[in-house]
Amino acid sequence: STAADAEEKLMNHLLSPDRYNKLIRPAVNSSQLVSIELQVSLAQLISVNEREQIMTTNVWLNQEWIDYRLAWKPSDYEGINMLRIPAKHIWLPDIVLYNNADGTYEVSLYTNAIVQNNGSIRWLPPAIYKSACKIEVKHFPFDQQNCTLKFRSWTYDHTEIDMVLKTSMASMDDFTPSGEWDIVALPGRRTENPLDPNYVDVTYDFIIKRKPLFYTINLIIPCVLITSLAILVFYLPSDCGEKMTLCISVLLALTVFLLLISKIVPPTSLDVPLIGKYLMFTMVLVTFSIVTSVCVLNVHHRSPSTHTMPPWVKLVFLERLPAYLFMKRPENNSPRQKPANCKKTRAENLCMDPADFYKNSTYFVNTASAKKYDMKITDTLDNVSSHQDFRLRTGTKFSPEVQEAIDGVSFIAEHMKSDDNDQSVIEDWKYVAMVVDRLFLWIFVLVCVLGTVGLFLQPLFQNHIAATNP
């Protein structure tokens, strides 16, 4: 007979209804345990849905056991020592994924089982599992997750079958790398319940680490750049009128990023994701920059008619702080300033203020003008007596017209002097606002750099999630 005839004869013999019932557990007696060796082979990590907390994987569930009823002598059947029998024609252990998330407990395809002549059976069905996975969002997007696959018999307890872990690690021989996750480890463990002797399961821990490049490019770097714009608010001149506009725009941009984060991570109150902490940190900074900008603008637009500058403000913001902030106030070269090095002469009244000059009892007048207004002149200075055009007036009164002109000139001089003083105070207030701006610029740069580095260095020191028994 041919090999095909021998195989058909063997198949009919093994699966004959008279000697084999696929509904009966392959045990010699009721007290015998059927040992099931189990190993998971990971083919693909399809996705991890953070918001729904579901991990989708493509695995091969390798199961091995012995069915004494399917043993034969190869010499009786043309030396055939292995058969491939459709799985639905033999007894199968009803091992299912206990922590599935979509109600699909069984495998995707009932493949053929490989049966050896000694009765050992190896069944390797593929399955796409959606398992519940508790997402730890504390270090997102630099996070590491521990998702488990828990396998257990649905109807048989520990008194009927014994689940044995074939190897301590899941197989990755046929694994296709994921673009989002790195596999850190796939340890397996066999779990028994001391309080329930009938309980046994096999659990695999999928310890995976996220590849953060996508979120770094699309979330973190834009947030850092937007935060730097908030810092530049303090370098913006107060006169341009765009300080508040820039602050509000940056705050709105950060709010949009915060909404994006809320759609990615699960709505849990146990932890705040790292990127969420950073966004809140930057939003607090921007809010504080708005408050400080309001204060700076208030100082910038102060005047002598509304505010008096306290001495301590002059001491701190005009004398002390600028040196520490590397600021140097330019010299005031206003043409209205009095000459600083006016030389003292015998005619020192020439250096007096206009009001004092005209009110003084002695000053120079033109001789022609003096005759016209009947002024008495006298030569009292040696260095002036030689001049024919100018003489000194002694203490005589002016005519009403001249006195009125002198009063007008004196009023104008006093008004100009008052304007100069007011303008000087206004410039002082503006410089104080500039110093405050520069002070907060350095403070914000320091806080922003330290806060950013401190937050994003945390994942480097996180502990790896280890597999622990429940």
UniProtKB/Swiss-Prot annotation:
Top-level taxonomic group: Eukaryota
Recorded catalytic activity of this chain's protein: Ca(2+)(in) = Ca(2+)(out); K(+)(in) = K(+)(out); Na(+)(in) = Na(+)(out)
Site description Key residue for a low dissociation (K(off)) from the conotoxin BuIA, residues in chain: I114
Keyword terms, alphabetized: Cell membrane, Disulfide bond, Glycoprotein, Ion channel, Ion transport, Ligand-gated ion channel, Membrane, Metal-binding, Receptor, Signal, Sodium, Synapse, Transmembrane, Transmembrane helix, Transport
Positions on the Cytoplasmic side per record topology: 238-245, 300-438
Intervals, Extracellular compartment: 4-216, 267-278, 460-470
Assigned GO CC terms: acetylcholine-gated channel complex; neuron projection; plasma membrane; postsynaptic membrane; synapse
Presence of keyword Iron: no
Signal peptide: 1-3
Activity regulation text: Activated by a myriad of ligands such as acetylcholine, cytisine, nicotine, choline and epibatidine. The heteropentamer CHRNA3:CHRNB4 activity is blocked by the alpha-conotoxin ImI and AuIB.
Location of this chain's protein in the cell: Synaptic cell membrane; Cell membrane
Positions contributing to Na(+) binding: E242
Topology in membrane: Multi-pass membrane protein
A Pfam family reported for this protein in Swiss-Prot or TrEMBL: Neur_chan_memb
BP GO terms, sorted: acetylcholine receptor signaling pathway; chemical synaptic transmission; membrane depolarization; monoatomic ion transmembrane transport
Transmembrane region(s): 217-237, 246-266, 279-299, 439-459
Subunit structure: Neuronal AChR is composed of two different types of subunits: alpha and beta. CHRNB4/Beta-4 subunit can be combined to CHRNA2/alpha-2, CHRNA3/alpha-3 or CHRNA4/alpha-4, CHRNA5/alpha-5 and CHRNB3/beta-3 to give rise to functional receptors.
Family: Belongs to the ligand-gated ion channel (TC 1.A.9) family. Acetylcholine receptor (TC 1.A.9.1) subfamily. Beta-4/CHRNB4 sub-subfamily.
UniProt xrefs under NCBIfam families: LIC (TIGR00860)
Function per UniProt: Component of neuronal acetylcholine receptors (nAChRs) that function as pentameric, ligand-gated cation channels with high calcium permeability among other activities. nAChRs are excitatory neurotrasnmitter receptors formed by a collection of nAChR subunits known to mediate synaptic transmission in the nervous system and the neuromuscular junction. Each nAchR subunit confers differential attributes to channel properties, including activation, deactivation and desensitization kinetics, pH sensitivity, cation permeability, and binding to allosteric modulators.
Protein's name in the database: Neuronal acetylcholine receptor subunit beta-4
Species of provenance: Gallus gallus
Gene: CHRNB4
